[in-house]
Amino acid sequence: MSQAVESRTRIKSERYESGVIPYAKMGYWDPEYVIKDTDILALFRCTPQPGVDPVEAAAALAGESSTATWTVVWTDLLTACDLYRAKAFRVDPVPSAADTYFCYIAYDIDLFEEGSLANLTASIIGNIFGFKAVKALRLEDMRFPVALLKTYQGPATGVVVERERMDKFGRPLLGATVKPKLGLSGKNYGRVVFEGLKGGLDFLKDDENINSQPFMRYRERFLYSMEGVNHAACLTGEVKGHYLNTTAATMEDMYERANFARDLGSVIVMIDLVIGYTAIQSMGKWSRDNDVILHLHRAGNSTYSRQKNHGMNFRVICKWMRMSGCDHIHAGTVVGKLEGDPLMIKGFYNTLLDTKTEVNLPQGLFFAQDWASLRKCVPVASGGIHCGQMHQLINYLGDDVVLQFGGGTIGHPDGIQAGATANRVALECMVLARNEGRDYIAEGPQILRDAAKTCGPLQTALDLWKDITFNYASTDTADFVETATANV
């Protein structure tokens, strides 16, 4: 027997000895590992407990998210365990964060059921976030191989088909959320929908927590909302929609509500992130089968995505939701009232809209990603935005986005229709200025003032909200900053 064979045999024998062996010595750490095209890659931000070696922490994460438990088990010998072990292959210190490390882990594709987000997440985020050896842990990014992505449906409709169905091209789509969230009767709710759509919006929207409460059952809301949609469409000659929230206690109830919305002629239905991954995928499949756009409200995401040291980065949620079948997802505004660093938001939007995503560390994109022809998911900008920010919104977010002005429509002093008209005129004048080649970013406020001379609702809105912004420091910011290239 050669010396090399003897060495491999000895290492393998030691690896399977009974008792507790460090994860790194059990095969979960391999700095020489060669990444395969079919591997799933995950990047964790890990803060080990004092005294825990970062390499051992990374190996523990790899082990506990794949095949390991706390001690050696003899049944490992009955499997292709060397193949099925996840491999931690790289550990880097996080810039400007003491005792915190980026841990790169590769998973063999056979560890995951095809097309099942529930199975994927049960491994990747299943129990390692409660692991005592780490003080804090965050899933920052993932890369999915084309072979796995081909087993996922992707967005039910996609950007191109949605624009064709809505007959809206060359500009962002406009929407608003009905306010107040709760308490309106069905008839009053439908009136809000009608006024907003008649004033120039493309969509009105249920909020995340309006389902089927005693003050307004879902059938009332759906009926009156669709009456408003159809009336506004007839008056304006435009295709209109209202996101009818089908979120419910059971899948049977959700299908019942979605079928009712479809039968009423709705072009779009809505779900909340809190319904869970299996329910989201199920509704994605239903939407594809029924030719209905699927809007996802990210209700609950900030409970685990906002803090930088523990939880999960929202870009991972964006990837999972694009895979699972959602056509829309709220992804930040930059200038609104909700968490949103400009670089991070750009990374979210690129994740949802790119056909191939390149590595971009300032935007938090650690892996290149080929999206395997999955359709694009439309980002939704919602929360504390108004027409006075239109030039900033177009500059930051581009055309493939839904701009949701809730309070910025329904809070207009002259009424909902006037608020909608103000937003539509602001959008149209800014897109026109951009298409004419003007410096609409620098001239934005003046462009809006000029348009307001012939649009009373816009003038009123500009006078009311002026340059209101929500300037708070973001908690989730880039770890790597863009720097100028030096001339040598």
UniProtKB/Swiss-Prot annotation:
The active site is at residues 179, 297. Keywords: Calvin cycle, Carbon dioxide fixation, Chloroplast, Lyase, Magnesium, Metal-binding, Monooxygenase, Oxidoreductase, Photorespiration, Photosynthesis, Plastid. The modification N6-carboxylysine is found at residue 205. InterPro entries: RuBisCO, RuBisCo_large_chain_AS, RuBisCO_lsu_C, RuBisCO_lsu_C_sf, RuBisCO_lsu_fd_N, RuBisCO_lsu_N_sf, RuBisCO_lsuI. It is found in: Plastid, Chloroplast. Its EC number is 4.1.1.39. Its main location: plastid. Its cofactor is Mg(2+). One of its GO terms (molecular function) is ribulose-bisphosphate carboxylase activity. It catalyses: 2 (2R)-3-phosphoglycerate + 2 H(+) = D-ribulose 1,5-bisphosphate + CO2 + H2O; D-ribulose 1,5-bisphosphate + O2 = 2-phosphoglycolate + (2R)-3-phosphoglycerate + 2 H(+). GO terms for biological process: reductive pentose-phosphate cycle. Mg(2+) binds at residues 205, 207-208. It comes from the Eukaryota. CDD domains: RuBisCO_large_I. The record marks 337 as: Transition state stabilizer. Substrate binds at residues 127, 177, 181, 298, 330, 382. Pfam families: RuBisCO_large, RuBisCO_large_N. Binds 1 Mg(2+) ion per subunit. The basic functional RuBisCO is composed of a large chain homodimer in a 'head-to-tail' conformation. In form I RuBisCO this homodimer is arranged in a barrel-like tetramer with the small subunits forming a tetrameric 'cap' on each end of the 'barrel'. Belongs to the RuBisCO large chain family. Type I subfamily. Heterohexadecamer of 8 large chains and 8 small chains. This is Ribulose bisphosphate carboxylase large chain. The gene is rbcL.
